[in-house]
From Swiss-Prot:
This is Ras-related protein Rab-1B. Residues 204-206 form a propeptide. GO terms for molecular function: GTP binding; GTPase activity. The keyword Cytoplasm applies. A motif (Effector region) lies at residues 37-45. It is found in: Cytoplasm; Membrane; Preautophagosomal structure membrane. One of its GO terms (biological process) is autophagy. It comes from Dictyostelium discoideum. The small GTPases Rab are key regulators of intracellular membrane trafficking, from the formation of transport vesicles to their fusion with membranes. Rabs cycle between an inactive GDP-bound form and an active GTP-bound form that is able to recruit to membranes different set of downstream effectors directly responsible for vesicle formation, movement, tethering and fusion. Rab1B regulates vesicular transport between the endoplasmic reticulum and successive Golgi compartments.
Length: 206
């Protein structure tokens, strides 16, 4: 075990281009925000270490490009992810409608029992909001995942979103299975690299 941390969790941010994935990452990792929009090319990542229930957890958070032309590149990053945050823009109904497609991507590429979270970003834009909170919550409930509305600009619920993910993953790491049929098979990560890309959809980590 690495003396600097007890767990290393790999998280993935996915969703349409322009929904604010990079801004969420910057807010959580660096506590910064910029109005400038620069589309992510391929993938980017940041690391933040947190203390949760007396355990030091290193979060490696990958920000993926939302554009279709990068799907082949980014799909490989689903494998080995412990948690995936699906982000939509509360002022853009198309981005919410596309959440179902992103969920299908998770089913196709991620391990079967990966932790998921639905996030409606830009909740500070109250006058421009067109995706009802109740509609998004109903969808999240229908697929059995948590839901939060966030604002990378005001930092509302950003910390909570990532802490929810870390907490849920840690439960699985500690052997607490929310679903008895779960095939999640993760252990404390050794600092020797990432999970190799393979055909099996099992969250084993080496």
């Amino acid at each position: 075990m690495n003396p600097e941390y007890d767990y290393l969790f790999k998280l993935l941010l996915i969703g349409d281009s322009g929904v604010g994935k990079s801004c969420l990452l910057l807010r959580f990792a660096d506590d910064t925000y910029t109005e400038s929009y620069i589309s992510t090319i391929g993938v980017d990542f940041k690391i933040r270490t947190i203390n949760l229930d007396g355990k030091i957890i290193k979060l490696q958070i990958w920000d993926t490009a939302g554009q279709e032309r990068f799907r082949t590149i980014t799909s490989s990053y689903y494998r080995g992810a412990h948690g995936i945050i699906v982000v939509y823009d509360v002022t853009d109904h198309v981005s919410f409608n596309n959440v179902k497609q992103w969920m299908q991507e998770i089913q196709r590429y991620a391990c079967d029992s990966v932790t998921r979270l639905l996030v409606g970003n830009k909740c500070d834009l109250i006058e421009k909001k067109i995706v009802d909170t109740s509609t998004a919550r109903e969808y999240a409930d229908s697929v059995g995942i948590p839901f939060l509305e966030t604002s990378a600009k005001s930092s509302a619920n950003v910390e909570q979103a990532f802490m929810i993910m870390a907490s849920e993953i840690k439960k699985l790491q500690g052997g607490i299975q929310p679903n008895n049929n779960s095939t999640y098979n993760a252990h404390v990560v050794k600092p020797t690299g990432f999970t190799p890309i393979g055909k099996k959809k099992k969250c084993s980590i080496i």
